[in-house]
């Protein structure tokens, strides 16, 4: 018997039925009703809308985290970043560099304070600004006392409790005269006695008046004074800034 040739009729059968001869043709699928198609489209759109967005990568630079170098905004603000030197309550240099980074809004407000004080023959000198969370942890390892250091807490490797400095929304500073010399204050920086408190009534009246003058200048631009430290001020809306662990150098 001669082998069966694959002729025109066989190819036509395949084109017409989608099956080779001898095969049972599959049952033709019915088209999806229009209302079912619309329902599927709506459900798909809702799923896409409510699906959680992919978590963005953590920032690795101050700029990516929304921090600005204060000296770029107000170059005439003096820096005395104590934690970049041993001249602080830990007696250890814990910062790799003497830099001052703050949230953009906070930095701009500080620049306005500086401009206003300059008209009065005064200026600002900054002791501390943004503090990476890892440094806060180092502070705690050196001085585990909540009266002096905000206890840092992390969950799944992410900071959940820390200092307002970790948010880039707090600044420690003092006043200087036109020559850059410190103006007398009730106590030194990082003094954890009652002299540091804003309600302290002892000591030199002129020093207390200077602290009040600094407070008035900062409050004018929206800063919130910390009652226990005459040098510490929080930027408005600090609660809306996340805790950061972005290094700087």
Placement of each model-derived feature along the sequence:
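Alpha-helical and His/Cys-centered functional microenvironments
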Residues: 14-16, 39, 236
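Ser/Thr/Pro/Gly-rich low-complexity, intrinsically disordered segments
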Residues: 1-8, 12, 16
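Beta-rich nucleic-acid/ligand-interaction surfaces
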Residues: 134-136, 233-240
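Bacterial N-terminal signal peptides
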Residues: 40-51
């Amino acid at each position: 018997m001669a082998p069966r040739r694959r002729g025109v009729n066989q190819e036509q059968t395949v084109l017409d039925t989608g099956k080779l001869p001898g095969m049972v043709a599959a049952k033709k699928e019915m088209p999806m009703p229009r209302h079912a198609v619309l329902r599927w489209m709506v459900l798909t759109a809702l799923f896409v809308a409510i699906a959680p967005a992919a978590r963005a990568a953590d920032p690795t630079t101050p700029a990516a985290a929304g921090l600005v170098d204060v000296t770029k905004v107000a170059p005439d603000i003096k820096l005395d970043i104590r934690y970049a030197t041993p001249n602080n309550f830990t007696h250890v240099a814990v910062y790799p560099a003497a830099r001052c980074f703050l949230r953009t809004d906070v930095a701009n407000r500080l620049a306005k304070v500086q401009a206003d004080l300059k008209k009065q023959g005064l200026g600002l000198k900054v002791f501390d600004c943004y503090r990476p969370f890892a440094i806060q942890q180092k502070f705690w390892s050196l001085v585990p006392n909540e009266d002096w250091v905000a206890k840092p807490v992390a969950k799944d490797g992410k900071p959940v409790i820390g200092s307002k400095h970790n948010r880039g929304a707090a600044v420690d500073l003092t006043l200087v005269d036109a020559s850059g010399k410190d103006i007398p204050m009730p106590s030194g920086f990082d003094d954890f006695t009652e002299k540091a408190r804003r309600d302290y009534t002892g000591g030199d009246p002129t020093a207390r008046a200077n602290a009040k003058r600094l407070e008035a200048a900062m409050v004018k631009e929206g800063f919130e004074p910390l009652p226990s430290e005459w040098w510490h001020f929080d930027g408005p809306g600090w609660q809306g800034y996340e805790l950061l662990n972005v290094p700087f150098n």
